[in-house]
Amino acid sequence: MDLDPHAGVQVGMRVVRGMDWKWGQQDGGEGGVGTVVELGRHGSPSTPDRTVVVQWDQGTRTNYRAGYQGAHDLLLYDNAQIGIRHPNIICDCCKKHGLRGMRWKCRVCFDYDLCTQCYMHNKHDLTHAFERYETSHSRPVTLSPRQGLPRIPLRGIFQGAKVVRGPDWEWGSQDGGEGKTGRVVDIRGWDVETGRSVASVTWADGTTNVYRVGHKGKVDLKCVGEAAGGFYYKEHLPKLGKPAELQRRVSADGQPFQRGDKVKCLLDTDVLRDMQEGHGGWNPRMAEFIGQMGTVHRITDRGDVRVQFNHETRWTFHPGALTKHNSFWVGDVVRVIDDLDTVKRLQAGHGEWTDDMAPALGRVGKVVKVFGDGNLRVAVGGQRWTFSPACLVACRPEEDANLGVAERARENKSAASVPVAGSLSVALDKLRTQKSDPEHPGRLVVEAALGNVARALDLLRRHPEQAGFHPAVDTKNQGRTALQVAAYLGQVELVRLLLQARASVDLLDEEGNTALHYTAMGNQPEATRLLLSAGCGVDAQNGTRSTALHVAVQRGFLEVVKILCEHGCDVNLPDAHADTPLHSAISAGAGASSIVEVLTEVPGIDVTATNSQGFTLLHHASLKGHVLAVRKILARARQLVDAKKEDGFTALHLAALNNHREVAQVLIREGRCDVNVRNRKLQSPLHLAVQQAHLGLVPLLVDAGCNVNTEDEEGDTALHVALQRHQLLPLVADRAGGDPGPLQLLSRLQASGLPGSTELTVGAAVACFLALEGADVSYANHRGRSPLDLATEGRVLKALQGCAQRFRERQAGGGGGVPPGPRHVLSTPNTVTNLHVSGTAGPEAAECLVCSELALLVLFSPCQHRTVCEECARRMKKCIRCQVIISKKLRPDGSEVVNAIQVPGPPRQLVEELQSRYRQMEERITCPICIDSHIRLVFQCGHGACAPCGAALNACPICRQPIRDRIQIFV
């Protein structure tokens, strides 16, 4: 039985009392609603594993059993607060699209669904049985008809409730001050992230704001006047802590469609006609397209799918009527699943499995070929493997932008060069075999292709000058002039002859190339000098906006590059992709290092140039692993070392993501970059190195001072990431393909005295290393899960705890290591405890770890450690055992120890003034158009906008002045 991971207990869920309830009126009575704010964890005496802490709307905060001792005290009422959504499902009563929370599907009627609110309000026939879906992936649970079942009224923070500030309040005096009341005017979702997770409150002074009631597990409000929130059927709600099973088969039509997907309708006409009601309607002509392949054009606001079958025919379909033909196509960015046993099983008969494929598990790659049997050729980690599509999951396109897949660079380069070279070669062959009139002016191009200088001169003499111009000299044959052909072939004498005959040096071929482009294509330095001496345009751009310098750089022709630079070409001109020649040189790899040196020595080069993907030259060099380019750019502009792309990635992020260890060393040692910089997802370079299992980079970043306890937007530290990913990927040092990372990591683990290191998986090895360096094994993420909770295998759990203990011993002995940064856990000091782990006795006199006196030790909250006496505890701010910030200090009798010095907080007026300044600063750097991104472009008038908005403007949106120039800034 596979459990649905999305249906597990998570902070933010809204709950009511369940069948095993024995805690009196702690919830305010039957029907009271609360929010899960903390999950139990291994080793905690008050909130052990399989328990939860609930913040009830009326104010009580207590822990309850969610499978502990086999009991379930709570029922799940709503899980929309944790982001559960059924994307293509519409409630057939309230017509809300993208049903949030649990889905209730009628077993009698065809395709009839209700949301939780409509189901509990007795919508639809009460004699019909329904199925309950906890998530879009879970297997349905069959329920009895609602008729005759008791309904319990809900009470708590709902529309109309009277509220005051609650336990997680952090909004200053927005409510008018402590004790002021407000009225809930609406319950809504937080943008598109979560549903029914925040409350809009109007306070007594008339101000209205939105506050968390379950969003991210936080509760900003306390109910002092309950409001009715509808009803619920107790028998139909799932037990909290008993997750639903995964569907055995997730069909393609159950997945959300995306533009470009290839789909078919495989239903009978009668079934399709019934399904189309309310989903685009039915047209008899639609029957003609049943079984035909179509392409998803767009998804409508209602979730229906608009499918294009040819240039003129489009139909709107119910999403359930369509089947994806193939989820992956050439160029798609995919991630290989990291479950070793599953991949081995799925590969049988689909490319098979070899142990050399192990490094690809969990990595991101690109589809380079789709075979007829549906199997895929995927480029990943510098290798190409054949995978079953079942082994792959789709990734967002932006992940590809930051991944320097070697195959992509080679494909892009060849795609840019082969068609031109190929078509030119074909044209030359045709010219050399052409049977044409010897007197025809186009014959001059043929003689140029054959290299016949004498016959070319004879042709020019037969066509005398007219007004100082030879009419034959610029005649085209196969789309090219004689000068262009001679320039490509390096026929210096012929080029000189044609120039003397006043051939046009800047005449364009069908692709916009001049003769100078042709000398660059053919690697002809002398012909290049001749054309430049004749006054040709050194910066002429072809149809792809490439200059001759771009062409020479892309083909690696060093001498031509030198000549063009000597003649003052513009090294900063961008092509159609906004790539400068230096971008192209970096893409060419180590083979173009000499060209990189030449370009970076040009006095006027702009090393801050950014291409269409938002990569500066330093970003691009870090992406491609070009060490020389990184050094040269840093020597000119070290201030770029921490510059961020739109997604927040810096050069170090890109080096860490793509396993460019030497680049990372240069950025850290020579560039002195910030090793703890974070992107828009709040990921540090260490997060990315661990995510991609780059074992050589992890120690480098840690040794450079990277904070091992930094959390991302999900609250995950690098230790969480290590245990969530690569858990089943074996750590094999001798198959690392020359990568010393696994061997170095193993040697450091073995040096610490960790036994059995050679049998560790990649995830476990990285996790143990991080724990040895001070990563907090008890750090709870936003879902309340600590690394100890994720270490499901007993051997790994024991090793992790041992490494953490070794770090603490090393710290106590004055050894090295990175101390864990200060943090706050999800526990709250006013939590009442219902449960105690059996076997824990009351405190007795023990030796204080600080003064060594025998005394009753103080209990620290939330970590629950007793380490010091009352006198020593007064001045402590962090527990000396686990480094967790202390929120409360309790004597054995339960009374609270007062701190030695109570530092007064800042005056309210000062706080408000600082808040006002912050808002003003934020407004000054925020784009005035989308009011979302930061300003990245400044216009000549002094106003600005973000890059996407600014690129589309012709006039300043503030002062209406025409925009003549855009200056990119780095904030």
Swiss-Prot record:
Entry keyword set: Actin-binding, ANK repeat, Cytoplasm, Endosome, Metal-binding, Notch signaling pathway, Phosphoprotein, Repeat, Transferase, Ubl conjugation, Ubl conjugation pathway, Zinc, Zinc-finger
Record localization: Cytoplasm; Endosome
Catalysed conversion reaction: S-ubiquitinyl-[E2 ubiquitin-conjugating enzyme]-L-cysteine + [acceptor protein]-L-lysine = [E2 ubiquitin-conjugating enzyme]-L-cysteine + N(6)-ubiquitinyl-[acceptor protein]-L-lysine
Chain positions recorded as Zn(2+) 2 binding sites: C106, C109, H124, H128
Post-translational modification Phosphoserine, affected residues: S251
Enzyme nomenclature, EC number: 2.3.2.27
PTM field: Ubiquitinated. Possibly via autoubiquitination.
ZnF (RING-type) ranges: 848-883, 927-960
This protein's record includes keyword DNA damage: no
UniProt-listed InterPro entries: Ankyrin_rpt, Ankyrin_rpt-contain_sf, MIB1/2_ZZ, Mib_Herc2, Mib_Herc2_sf, SH3_15, Znf_RING, Znf_RING/FYVE/PHD
GO BP terms, alphabetized: Notch signaling pathway; protein ubiquitination; regulation of postsynaptic neurotransmitter receptor internalization; regulation protein catabolic process at postsynapse
Superkingdom classification of source: Eukaryota
Domain MIB/HERC2: 1-80, 149-227
GO MF term set: actin binding; ubiquitin protein ligase activity; ubiquitin-protein transferase activity; zinc ion binding
ZnF locations on chain (ZZ-type): 86-138
Pathway: Protein modification; protein ubiquitination
Residues at which Zn(2+) 1 binds: C91, C94, C115, C118
Main location: cytoplasm
Residue spans of the ANK repeats: 478-507, 511-540, 544-573, 577-609, 613-642, 647-677, 681-710, 714-742, 783-812
Cellular component GO terms, alphabetical: cytoplasm; early endosome; glutamatergic synapse; plasma membrane; postsynapse; ubiquitin ligase complex
Enzyme class: transferase
Functional note: E3 ubiquitin-protein ligase that mediates ubiquitination of Delta receptors, which act as ligands of Notch proteins. Positively regulates the Delta-mediated Notch signaling by ubiquitinating the intracellular domain of Delta, leading to endocytosis of Delta receptors.
Quaternary data: Interacts with actin monomer.
Protein name: E3 ubiquitin-protein ligase MIB2
